[in-house]
A protein has these predicted regions:
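Short, charged/polar, Gly/Pro-enriched secondary-structure boundary elements
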Residues: 11, 70-72, 160-161
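Short cysteine-rich loop/turn motifs with clustered Cys
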Residues: 47-50
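The catalytic Nudix box helix
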Residues: 104-137, 152
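An acidic- and aromatic-residue-enriched active-site/binding cleft used to recognize and process polar
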Residues: 95-96, 139-141
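Long C-terminal interaction/binding lobes of large macromolecular proteins
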Residues: 132-137, 158, 175-178, 183
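Active-site-adjacent beta-strand/loop module that shapes the phosphate/pyrophosphate-binding cleft
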Residues: 140-163, 173
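N-terminal strand-loop-strand
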Residues: 44, 55-104, 108, 130-131, ...
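Nudix hydrolase/Nudix homology domain
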Residues: 1-43, 55, 99-102, 149, ...
């Protein structure tokens, strides 16, 4: 962990040449190092007794006076493709906080919610569309935010928005695969 911090300091000096954690998000070693460093910076006190935590040498477990293990926080999130009913188009979103780029719909899983229901809810809240044929396709750690992204595909019969949205998106757009290269997409490693 100490070596990773030294490396992080060096990388900051040369970030335009080597990128940042998002650039290397698919590298498991980078994802793990970023997640563990993030945990040590953000989880400082024992939730059981308020004492300062001491992390083990691997940076994977901390303990305070209570002796109970404290682990890095991982926030489950859903992300995925929404296809029209015949699968010929996908729905992309332009987020209000990152206008000018298109990406997939995504959001966090709420307490007590299964991931499939989280996907349905996020699509409904952000796009005002109902989805079905929800299929889990894989996961990826998202160390810069502490998330574990759970990827899905789904279909909708709702070509147009049928419900109110939460305002997170500027707008949505149906596209065919051959149109993707002409769109301003979010860079790899970002939403």
């Amino acid at each position: 962990v100490f070596a990773a911090r030294l490396l992080d300091t060096s990388v900051t000096q040369f970030s335009s040449q080597v990128g940042d954690a998002r650039t290397h998000a698919t590298d498991p070693g980078v994802a793990r190092a970023v997640a563990l460093l993030r945990a040590q910076e953000q989880i400082v006190f024992d939730p059981a007794d308020g004492s300062r935590l001491t992390w083990d040498n691997a940076g994977t477990t901390a303990r305070g006076r209570s002796g109970r293990p404290v682990f890095p926080r991982i926030d489950p999130a859903v992300i995925g493709l929404i296809q029209n009913s015949d699968g010929s188009q996908i729905l992309l979103a332009e987020h209000a906080r990152r206008s000018g780029f298109f990406s997939c719909v995504a959001g966090y899983v709420e307490a007590g919610e299964c991931v499939e229901d989280a996907w349905r809810r996020e699509v409904w809240e952000e796009t005002g569309r109902r989805v079905y044929d929800i299929v889990y396709v894989g996961s990826q750690p998202w160390p810069t935010t502490g998330a574990l992204m759970l990827g899905f595909t789904s279909r909708t019969d709702d070509v147009e928005q049928v419900g109110e949205t939460d305002g997170e998106l500027v707008h949505t757009r149906w596209v065919q695969r051959d149109q993707l290269s002409s769109l301003p997409l979010a860079r790899e490693g970002s939403l």
